[in-house]
């Protein structure tokens, strides 16, 4: 049954017939069936909600007729309806469409052939087309099933976690209710438990992230009690899978399958066995450039833009191009300033949920990614990749003006603005322009200071800065150097101080070779060579 908002949205999007493949009937709780609008259903339909009632499907041709505003409206309404079903505590298998919808992709576009074949497959299996039969979709892994618990159930699960924290892995995930609102993962009745380290995960995306560490990792759904001690690739190296033809080693079956597909043009055997996300009886499409395999032709087409460099989606604000529509959608939040995801610990806001999840590791102290060279740990994969450039010394991006080399293309683009004088980021309040968006964000705090210190009246743009500032008045210095005992109000200050003991000076002047502990000191020093006034 569509909500009033959904009806208005569907009316706005109609004007042509909406195609609806493979609906699912979802069993409602008894309390919901006995009261409210659902009680008015006929005997044959009572107690069931057809998934198509809250989900509208389009053919590819129909989807192309919608403008950007209509597509955004559709995306928001469908997620709202999905959240409504989830709040009822209904258990159902999640289709590929819903999973892609949560990631901001376009899974709701179906070809007529796909819809027909789906119905025929259900009929051949002796199942009533359009019904949920308590079994998984044959195109979806059994581990992709979902159980969305009600609010009271999640509170019970949180209480259990708080009373039985993991002794080995440290802090548990906090604010589950808050993260569940935005998280793309699936909440389970029982958490996934790592048999080697005892770490627990409520969401399958956290499950996958832990599983796909640089050293690998394998998790197991928690069994009764706290046993289930099995091997975990994060803590214990796992045996590799070797390709007999290509003589290459792989840590996962999916990697071996894709590698073997690149060596052979033979079609896969007709089998219904599901191996690491690939249905062996299903034809898949292989990229001619890198050999990566995909189950859908349109997914392959999107992937090939990486090799061709095609970027069909343009930002009408700054003219920047993107290869994926979702990347454009995320980029546009830079111009709108929208930051909907807030950290409950320090009040900091983020444009993307991934940024919030990564930031929360600062508070929990969780560091998942380890460098294989020096053993140093990092809270995010991107930070690990940037760190590894220190060991490889690779600097493939060279400035055509001065010959300076950079390890990242983005850093080269920022550097080139020092030659061109380009300052694309302008403050709408005072007109001052900046070469980097981060500099504009720092400057904007002058105009939008919301948090004021009650002791001295100084204002700050976010509550985390105010909390740090208040330590100046209280004299609190929780971060102490284990070498000399000197204490600091902030952790970054302790990290910089520690370099005095280690002798580490990572920032080197390319002109004279002088080394510095802090990057800011190097920047000030380089102005001497440039002839700028300090």
From Swiss-Prot:
Residues 49-120 form the KRAB domain. Gene3D superfamilies: 6.10.140.140, Classic Zinc Finger. A zinc finger (C2H2-type) spans 192-214, 285-307, 313-335, 341-363, 369-391, 397-419, 425-447, 451-473, 479-501, 507-529. It is found in: Nucleus. One of its GO terms (biological process) is regulation of transcription by RNA polymerase II. One of its GO terms (molecular function) is RNA polymerase II cis-regulatory region sequence-specific DNA binding. InterPro entries: KRAB (IPR001909), KRAB_dom_sf (IPR036051), Znf_C2H2_sf (IPR036236), Znf_C2H2_type (IPR013087). May be involved in transcriptional regulation. Belongs to the krueppel C2H2-type zinc-finger protein family. This is Zinc finger protein 671. It comes from Homo sapiens.
